[in-house]
Amino acid sequence: IFINTKIIAESPENLFWAGIGDAISKELEAQLSIRGHKVSHTPLMGNQLSLICIDPLIEYGKKAYEDCKNNVDSFELEQVVLDIIVTTGLVSNFMTTENDYYYNSSLAHGFYNGTSVIPNCIQHLHGEIVSFGSLVLLTYDKNYDECDRIMAFHKEMGLPLTMADIGLTEEDLPAVAERSSVTKEWTCVPYEVTKEKF
């Protein structure tokens, strides 16, 4: 992999911001989707690697985002870029095969896919919606302490905290749940997921 952080530092900051939002989901989705499965070496390695996805984003994300806004190629920006591209990329590759297993995504991306039927969501970036989907995942999983930690990071980064932040209303939820329920990600949960609860 060749990564030029100077070019990334000069890229549109909203894309960098959304990349952080998308990367937040990797650890959460990997941990949820693999829970309760007896797995072989490769997905087990991906699962362990996923455990270092969120902390660098929380530690360096705010400064890295500010540096990207100012076109500064910094240590913090480099750490976040490596996390987004290398760490999450390796996790994705280790946790997915074409036919044998799929532990790469879960409810955060399922939520994103569900919003694809809502016209107001189209203007929002993939990682922006997935970051809110991470809050949905954590709430559905009743992992409230981690949800509070991620919400604090969202607040610091200006990532979505409410449905309104991504153009959703309560009236949209049945359509989002219906669309989400037919995605592969809907099944990547260690328990039954219902549209009503979702």
Locate the predicted segments by residue:
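A glycine/threonine-rich phosphate-anchoring loop and its flanking beta-alpha core
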Residues: I1-L49
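Generic alpha-helical structural context detector
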Residues: D22-E29, L82, N113, L135-V136, ...
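A short secondary-structure junction motif
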Residues: E27, Q31-R35, A64, T87, ...
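C-terminal intrinsically disordered extensions
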Residues: R35-L49, C53, L57-G61, V176-F198
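Active-site segments that bind and position negatively charged phosphate/pyrophosphate groups
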Residues: V39-A152
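C-terminal charged capping/lid subdomain of soluble metabolic enzymes
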Residues: N143-F198
